[in-house]
């Protein structure tokens, strides 16, 4: 795992700090894969995700429902910055209802999964995937009644998440990660699952680069 703040680190730290007892919810994209790979689920009904349906914006509404049904449980929605834009207005609902859900934004300033495909399979012809437009998710979240922090290091995330666990109202953590972070393994377009490949396989096809 790379040094510094990354999607896998965030998910593993959430698992550690919740002792595996959280209800995890996801949006759609790279963060969804990391949430599936790096949180060690051992109990039923603790991962709420729309699977392969591609429903960006699903997670926050699902987290509101999960928190309403389980007021004494820790509910964490894992979102990308692209997904957060789809349904972030529902933070106002969570604030009005005083729901202590935790919204963790894995913010790489791109539509990460689509951009990864463009990198690996379309010669880095990036189209409609860059979101680096300066939107301040902390201020947006605060405007809708949530507590919010931006974090750029592992230490900052750990402190922010500890504070989020103690909060009685919605808490948003905007985690800044590298735009080129990738999720592995991958399956190329039109290929079967038994031809999936990881980063080492991919680098071998690129001459080790």
Spans of model-derived segments:
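Active-site diphosphate/adenylate-binding microenvironment
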Residues: 1-66
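Short coil/turn connectors at secondary-structure junctions
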Residues: 19-22, 42-45, 70-75, 88, ...
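Short gly/pro/ser/thr-enriched loop/turn and capping motifs at secondary-structure boundaries
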Residues: 32-33, 54-56, 84-85, 109-113, ...
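A short acidic, glycine-rich active-site loop
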Residues: 50-53, 123-132, 199, 203-206
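Conserved thiamine diphosphate
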Residues: 69-160
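Glycine/aspartate-rich loop-and-adjacent alpha/beta segment that forms the canonical ThDP
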Residues: 154, 162-209
């Amino acid at each position: 795992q790379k040094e510094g703040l990354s999607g896998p680190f965030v998910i593993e730290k959430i698992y550690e700090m919740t002792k595996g007892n959280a209800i995890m919810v996801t949006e759609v994209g790279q963060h969804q894969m990391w949430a599936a790979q790096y949180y060690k689920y051992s109990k039923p009904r603790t991962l709420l995700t729309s699977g392969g349906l591609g429903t960006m914006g699903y997670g926050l509404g699902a987290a509101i429902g999960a928190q309403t049904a389980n007021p004494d449980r820790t509910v964490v929605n894992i979102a990308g910055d692209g997904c957060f834009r789809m349904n972030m207005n529902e933070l106002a609902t969570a604030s009005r209802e005083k729901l202590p859900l935790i919204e963790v934004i894995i913010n790489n300033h791109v539509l990460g999964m689509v951009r990864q495909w463009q990198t690996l399979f379309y010669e880095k012809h990036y189209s409609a995937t860059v979101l680096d437009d300066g939107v301040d998710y902390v201020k947006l979240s605060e405007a809708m009644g949530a507590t919010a922090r931006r974090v750029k290091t592992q230490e900052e995330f750990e402190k922010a998440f500890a504070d989020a666990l103690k909060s009685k109202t919605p808490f948003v953590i905007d985690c800044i990660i590298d735009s080129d972070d990738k999720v592995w393994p991958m399956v190329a377009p039109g290929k079967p699952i038994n031809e999936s490949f990881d980063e080492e396989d991919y680098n071998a096809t690129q001459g080790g680069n």
